[in-house]
Swiss-Prot record:
Family annotation (InterPro entries): Ntn_hydrolases_N, Proteasome_alpha, Proteasome_alpha-type, Proteasome_asu_N, Proteasome_sua/b
Main location: cytoplasm
Modified residues (N6-acetyllysine): 227
Subunit composition and interactions: The 26S proteasome consists of a 20S proteasome core and two 19S regulatory subunits. The 20S proteasome core is a barrel-shaped complex made of 28 subunits that are arranged in four stacked rings. The two outer rings are each formed by seven alpha subunits, and the two inner rings are formed by seven beta subunits. The proteolytic activity is exerted by three beta-subunits PSMB5, PSMB6 and PSMB7. PSMA7 interacts directly with the PSMG1-PSMG2 heterodimer which promotes 20S proteasome assembly. Interacts with HIF1A. Interacts with RAB7A. Interacts with PRKN. Interacts with ABL1 and ABL2.
Function: Component of the 20S core proteasome complex involved in the proteolytic degradation of most intracellular proteins. This complex plays numerous essential roles within the cell by associating with different regulatory particles. Associated with two 19S regulatory particles, forms the 26S proteasome and thus participates in the ATP-dependent degradation of ubiquitinated proteins.
Record's protein name: Proteasome subunit alpha type-7
Xref: Pfam families: Proteasome, Proteasome_A_N
Organism: Mus musculus
Posttranslational modification: Phosphorylation by ABL1 or ABL2 leads to an inhibition of proteasomal activity and cell cycle transition blocks.
Length: 248
């Protein structure tokens, strides 16, 4: 029997191959990074080069789900569109029903449950996306969650998904400290530094979104990103000079 054809059939050694193939699709997607700061959450995504005549505003990997929640994804864009639309409807339905916005965990659990249903149903296939979901709960607490095609979800301080996830996660494990997220600017710089581990040609290939407590989602423009990249480069040069002085 071909165990990789049927979604709902386990192989003898306990694998659901279609779910694993969906996870492989995520690994081929653009790298996305999320970091939870003290009063800010930041999402950064590697921008693929677009065709010369294409409007790059239509190629977005970061989107708002509600006033207090947004997400970035890696994987199949068409699959992500379905998940995003369903999540937005759920956010609106929740607001109409209980007259409060969703918590970040609530909408993450909804997205994870939707993905899980598609791993257990005939005539469907798993969603080929992983998502980083960030936002603020009504008490002002910043949150960061990650979901994968199998329907599992976890809370994180910082995480990465997509093709460069392994090296970016290693960078974050070494560099994520309380001092590194002391201010909003430092948190933004940490995300950019993490992305520069895998992104070529600096800030022009980075898409960045920030959300501060009680403020709407803000997508940074290329000039703002370049300013941060220039500051990071300057800091690197100064650190190199200090090292050389110590060595001599």
């Amino acid at each position: 029997m071909s165990y990789d054809r049927a979604i709902t059939v386990f192989s003898p050694d306990g694998h659901l191959f279609q779910v694993e193939y969906a996870q492989e699709a995520v690994k081929k997607g653009s790298t996305a990074v999320g970091v939870r700061g003290k009063d800010i959450v930041v999402l950064g995504v590697e921008k693929k080069s677009v065709a010369k005549l294409q409007d790059e505003r239509t190629v977005r990997k970061i989107c708002a789900l509600d006033d207090n929640v947004c997400m970035a994804f890696a994987g199949l864009t068409a699959d992500a569109r379905i998940v995003i639309n369903r999540a937005r409807v759920e956010c609106q339905s929740h607001r109409l029903t209980v007259e409060d916005p969703v918590t970040v965990e609530y909408i993450t659990r909804y997205i994870a449950s939707l993905k899980q249903r598609y791993t257990q149903s005939n005539g469907r296939r798993p969603f080929g996306i992983s998502a980083l979901i960030v936002g603020f709960d009504f008490d002002g607490t910043p949150r960061l969650y990650q979901t994968d095609p199998s329907g599992t979800y976890h809370a994180w301080k910082a995480n990465a998904i997509g093709r460069g996830a392994k090296s970016v996660r290693e960078f974050l494990e070494k560099n994520y400290t309380d001092d590194a997220i002391e201010t909003d600017d430092l948190t933004i710089k940490l995300v950019i530094k993490a992305l520069l581990e895998v992104v070529q040609s600096g800030g022009k290939n980075i898409e960045l979104a920030v959300m501060r407590r009680d403020q709407p989602l803000k997508i940074l423009n290329p000039e703002e990103i370049e300013k941060y990249v220039a500051e990071i480069e300057k800091e690197k040069e100064e650190n190199e000079k200090k090292k050389q002085k110590k060595a001599s």
